[in-house]
Amino acid sequence: MPIFTAQELAERFNLQLFGDGNLRIHGVATLTQASPEQLSFLANPRYLTQLLNSRAGVIVLHADDVKTASGTVLIAKDPYVTFAKIAALFDIKPAREAGIHPLATVDPSAHVSPTAHVGAFVSIGARSSIGASCIIGTGSIIGDDCTIDDGSELIARVTLISKVRLGKRVRIHPGAVLGGEGFGLAMENGHWIKIPQLGGVVIGDDCEIGANSCIDRGALDDTVLEEDVHIDNLVQIAHNCRIGAHTAIAGCTGIAGSAKIGRYCLLGGHVGVVGHLQICDNVVITGKSVVRNSIHTPGEYSSGTPLTDNRTWRKNAVRFKQLDMLVRRMMAVSKEKA
């Protein structure tokens, strides 16, 4: 585990230091759990009480909070971002040796960079390409005509079915499936006819896709995630969707076919997005909301039902069914008074 002094961290990240610059930091932790040899941070005033009682050796905080802390502190414009960068220094991953495991299967027409790591029980299909310094984890399946650019990682048991193109430094977690058939059906004489899904999936540079998430390939055009998109676990992105750069989508969200999500959007957990609509840039959708119409103005939107005690909720549920009747009565009374 690496060790850094407070002074070294201040110089590396251009931070203002108050206190003992020779203090040695062995790791990071929360305010409540940090030891005198660890660094923590304060980014939210609601945790001010934890700051006052913290044993952390070094604390990263905003200049406005410096008077509330004792001991060694590092002043940051954005303490949360700075903490993330410092924590990355302690996130040491074991090196993977370059080469193809003897239990992996690689089609003769596929290309694997000599600097890539291909783990056990991996299958790589025809005409697929694995770039430099890629990591293809145990049990991953890469179908035909897939391209994985330099520095990307499939952690384990990731499936790229076909026509999937990953950019540079893409990271995909276990159980994710990319390039599956989109849900395209047409009704004829009382029976469903499957619509061929002839497109692919394109993932931009620096994207991350969580465990057990699915991104379907397009029917004709590709399904696209632009650069630096972050997808949580258990997210469904249907065929022909386009997700704008720097957007983040939380777990259990479902996005129906051909929806277009803008850049720098945030979708909370369990959001539903109806197909064939557009959401502009810089939109926040709070958890459990359902987006039924296009959004053309940046801002925060909600449609989820707020939590109340069960007794109140049951009463309101009954009243909700009576809303139409009550409105009609009010309109009738209003007409009589007029």
Curated annotation (Swiss-Prot):
GO terms for cellular component: membrane. The keyword Kinase does not apply. GO terms for molecular function: N-acyltransferase activity. Keywords: Acyltransferase, Lipid A biosynthesis, Lipid biosynthesis, Lipid metabolism, Repeat, Transferase. Its EC number is 2.3.1.191. Pathway: Bacterial outer membrane biogenesis; LPS lipid A biosynthesis. It holds the Pfam family Hexapep_2. Coiled coil: none annotated. The active site is at H239 (proton acceptor). The keyword Lipid biosynthesis applies. One of its GO terms (biological process) is lipid A biosynthetic process. It catalyses: a UDP-3-O-[(3R)-3-hydroxyacyl]-alpha-D-glucosamine + a (3R)-hydroxyacyl-[ACP] = a UDP-2-N,3-O-bis[(3R)-3-hydroxyacyl]-alpha-D-glucosamine + holo-[ACP] + H(+). Homotrimer. NCBIfam families: lipid_A_lpxD (TIGR01853), PRK00892.1 (NF002060). HAMAP family: LpxD. Belongs to the transferase hexapeptide repeat family. LpxD subfamily. Catalyzes the N-acylation of UDP-3-O-acylglucosamine using 3-hydroxyacyl-ACP as the acyl donor. Is involved in the biosynthesis of lipid A, a phosphorylated glycolipid that anchors the lipopolysaccharide to the outer membrane of the cell. This is UDP-3-O-acylglucosamine N-acyltransferase. The lineage of its organism: Bacteria, Pseudomonadati, Pseudomonadota, Gammaproteobacteria, Lysobacterales. The gene is lpxD.
